[in-house]
Amino acid sequence: MLRCWGPHWGWVPWAPTPWLLLSLLVCTVPFGLLGEETRQVSMEVISGWPNPQNLLHIRAVGSNSTLHYVWSSLGPPAVVLVATNTTQSVLNVNWSLLLSPDPAGALMVLPKNSIQFSSALVFTRLLEFDSTNVSEGTQPPGKPYPPYSLAKFSWNNVTNSLDLATLSAIFRGHPVDDPTGAFANGSLTFKVQAFSRSGRPAQPPRLLHTADVCQVEVALVGASPRGNHSLFGLEVATLGQGPDCPSVNEQDSIDDEYAPAVFQLNRLLWGSSPSGFMQWRPVAFSQEQRARESALACQASALHPTLAYPLPHSPIVQAFFGSQNNFCAFNLTFGAPTGPGYWDQHYLCWSMLLGIGFPPVDSFSPLVLGIMAVALGAPGLMFLGGGLFLLLRHKQYSEYQSIN
């Protein structure tokens, strides 16, 4: 079980010594001076047949490699990610086969022998729990309501939201069958954004990104909860690389400038680096302004095989990988029974990175480097000054000659 901490739960499990801080300071500075890697990034909606279909292709070309991210809302929202060792690899789509009951082989990246890594991620269900009279930290975080299957959502035409200036597009959906009218004025959105160089978004949690990743921002806005203290979550499924599920680990930090009071970074790894990864700050927000006061605690369950129950069918995953069934799934839940929550403004937003290669690593921010320099430099200067004073004083005494 991974615990995700909001502002009231931020903590550092160890107290760094001055020598550790000094070594980190020395080791961090050179990496901050390295140049930024860039890629030529294109984003296009691939025209469907006979009607427009939501198939978004991100192609990021580097000096000797190409990354492909293929997003689709055919079935549940899903992405196929592929890395090749050539700058000439292309995506091939067989629409008649893709829209058939058996779409295996409809999606290919060519040449096939250039593929170095491939996997997929599927957002299968929107979860809702009644957290009334539930103590904090309980799992599950309340009585579950029937989940919303994202395969049974109706999605907008993503072409209308395509923004080539920011390399972003938005999938916006609501249930096809909504007898209670919970989504009459609400929607679930997946904003996908690619990057041609390293940087950080302007809004929290300000995840550090490189040209090897795309960012996904999931937002639930305006939907009516089925209880007064509903907590929401997402079920996420991925392909396992062999018999075992991918690993998830936590990284702790002493720097929280970009995500105040959040000292943790979570990663899902599809294998030993460099391979594929999913990376996120363990924090969501209940207000659009995303201030610290609206930060939500969250939890991520351990990954588990899904052989015991069927997952919603994703046509693009089956189109690329065939009939593989070694899926693993985990749940992300946002909020706690007390404190801020979705009930504040009927708003919930969470961000993550999806990438191939080495996950971006936060170096210390200039503010923290400055504080460390002052904290460690001042005692050093005092020590050096004291040593010089004693040396000069000793020299004066050694040069004194008695008049006798």
UniProtKB/Swiss-Prot annotation:
- UniProt motif Lysosomal targeting motif: location: 400-404
> What topology does the record note for this protein and the membrane?
Single-pass type I membrane protein
Organism, scientific name:
Rattus norvegicus (Rat)
Cell location: Lysosome membrane
Description of how the protein assembles with itself and partners: Interacts (via lumenal domain) with lysosomal protein MFSD1; the interaction starts while both proteins are still in the endoplasmic reticulum and is required for stabilization of MFSD1 in lysosomes but has no direct effect on its targeting to lysosomes or transporter activity.
What post-translational modification does the entry describe?
Highly N-glycosylated. N-glycosylation is essential for GLMP stability and for MFSD1 lysosomal localization.
Which residues does UniProt call coiled coil? none
This one is known as Glycosylated lysosomal membrane protein
Q: What is its main location?
A: membrane
Listed InterPro entries: NCU-G1 (IPR029382)
Q: Where are the transmembrane segments?
A: 371-391
Q: Which residues lie on this side of the membrane: Cytoplasmic?
A: 392-404
